[in-house]
């Protein structure tokens, strides 16, 4: 059972499932200045991933891991248990065979973009923006926002190495309804997971989108997250 810990998460593989959880307060780590690293949107991102996996699994034919359990633990950490997806990451497939997989991803991406909303939803991918900024819950009279994975790298596409079939697309914590330009095709390169967060300069349309968020709109929310996917889905059901 492989396991590892980062500055904000603990991960563990079991025989048939996978655990991704936030660190409990007693596990918080210190940075080089000796200050505790506290990720304010950490649990919200996992809650968003759980809601997204349920939604995508119910509404599309895109292969995603089934959520076994998601919720807060008694020690203050947030746990997300999912089924284990068999296979290897796309980055381990020979370049000569990757076109077969990429064709499947493009079809799934088209399916995602068929899911639309008039409201932005999901944690922001621009983590380097100031945490104390006032964020706008941006609305549109037309359903112009499409569902985006927002971290569709080769590491997040799990493939059967024999059949080259996509067995699962994982790591949906940044997913939500956004402009099409948010879902950059990192699966066509070797950029690692989280590349979109670290490479905002690679996506100039995003900068233009964020620049208009200074205009007063319908509602304001403070902090690193906008609306969770579950909030939007509940609103869609009520309408």
Predicted regions and their residues:
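An alpha-helical support segment within catalytic cores of ATP-dependent transferases
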Residues: 72-73, 101-150, 160-165
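Active-site Asp-x-Gly
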Residues: 142-148, 153, 160-218
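A generic local structural motif
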Residues: 5-6, 132-134, 154-155
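Short, surface-exposed, charged/polar-biased interaction segments
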Residues: 74, 88, 126, 133, ...
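Soluble or luminal CAZymes and related metallo-dependent hydrolases
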Residues: 44-48, 97-104, 140, 149, ...
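Phosphate/pyrophosphate-binding loops and the adjoining catalytic core of nucleotide-dependent enzymes
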Residues: 1-33, 112, 116-120, 146, ...
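Well-ordered beta-strand positions
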Residues: 11-12, 158-160
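ATP-binding pocket architecture of kinase catalytic cores
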Residues: 2-124
């Amino acid at each position: 059972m492989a396991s590892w810990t980062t500055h904000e998460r603990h991960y563990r593989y079991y025989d048939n499932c996978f655990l991704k959880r936030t660190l409990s307060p007693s596990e918080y780590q210190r940075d080089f200045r000796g200050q505790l690293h506290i990720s304010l949107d950490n649990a919200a991102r996992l809650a968003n991933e759980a809601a997204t996996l349920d939604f995508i699994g119910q509404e599309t034919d895109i292969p995603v891991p089934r959520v076994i359990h998601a919720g807060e633990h008694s020690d203050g950490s947030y746990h997300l248990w999912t089924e284990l997806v068999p296979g290897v990451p796309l980055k381990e497939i020979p370049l000569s065979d990757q076109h077969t997989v990429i064709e499947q991803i493009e079809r799934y991406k088209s399916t995602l973009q068929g899911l639309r909303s008039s409201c932005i939803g999901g944690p922001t991918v621009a983590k380097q923006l100031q945490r104390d900024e006032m964020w706008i819950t941006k609305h549109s009279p037309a359903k112009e926002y499409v569902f985006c994975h927002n971290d569709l790298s080769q590491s997040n596409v799990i493939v059967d190495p024999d059949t080259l079939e996509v067995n699962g697309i994982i790591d949906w914590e940044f997913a939500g309804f956004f402009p099409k330009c948010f879902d950059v095709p990192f699966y066509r390169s070797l950029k690692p997971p989280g590349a979109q967060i670290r490479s905002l300069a690679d996506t100039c349309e995003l900068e233009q989108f964020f620049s208009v968020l200074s205009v007063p709109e319908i509602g304001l929310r403070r902090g690193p997250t906008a609306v969770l996917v579950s909030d939007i889905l509940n609103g869609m059901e009520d309408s």
